[in-house]
Every structure is written in structure tokens, then in C-alpha cells.
């Protein structure tokens, strides 16, 4: 099975969870990133050559992004009443539904912020994600994906495909 076929199957169960349940996973991920920051910093520094404070800034950005989406996302995904075309005659309710599978191709220079940071809102919205990190920073991406799985993202909902794109 391809990563996309597995993601399509796994996405249905993930989308069936409420946005609040998915937000709890993102909050747990936030906590895990901060608990294991030394390991993440070591990996990111080794792969990118960044100074420790720059790697920390990216790691912290990812954790805070996760927390932000976990806090505001469920409200953004809730049905919203909107003005109808004819104000007194119509009511309109906007509903949000997952798209299915989201593909992310990320560069080497911000392997956590641009790879995982982009995956977080997609996951919160109930989508599955297939991530293809740059070949120079695969271990950093795999580290973050392992934390997301530990936080509660089900198997198949978040996959990593490694290769040079050929």
C-alpha cells in the first residue's frame, strides 16, 4: 500500500473524532516537544547546522503553534451562522469538513516549523497528512512525527515518505 492509500483509510476514523479530541492530541504534542526539547535540539542542530538558540526558536515555535491551533481551532471548525442573501428571509450556516489527505513537501532550513507546523492545522481539521521532508532533515521530521504519534495521532494518519523526489 502507498502512504496515500493508507492515509485515506486512516483519515476516516480520525475525521470522525471531534475537533476537541483532536485538539487534545495537539496539546499533548506541545507538552512532549517541550519535555524532549534537548533531544530535538540535538537532532535539528546536527542536520541543519543551526546554532542552538536558532534551533530552540524553531522548536518553541512548533510547540506554540500546536498550542495555538489546539486552543482556537475547535472554535474555528464549529458551525458558524452567517448572513443570508436576504437578511430577514434566509439563514446560512457554514460547516467545515476535512479535505482528506494533505501532502506536504518541506525544505531543509526549517524542518520542524515548515513540515510539522504545516501539518498541525491539517491534522486538527481532521485530515491525514503525508509528509516528504528534505533528505537532509529526515531525522528531525521523523522525531517530530514520532512525538505526534505518541501524543495520539493514529497510525496511518500521519506518514513520512523519504526520498529525493525522483
Residues of each region from the PLM?
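N-terminal Rossmann-like NAD(P)+-binding subdomain of aldehyde/semialdehyde dehydrogenases
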Residues: 1-90
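Rossmann-like NAD(P) dinucleotide-binding subdomain of oxidoreductase/dehydrogenase enzymes
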Residues: 34, 81-166
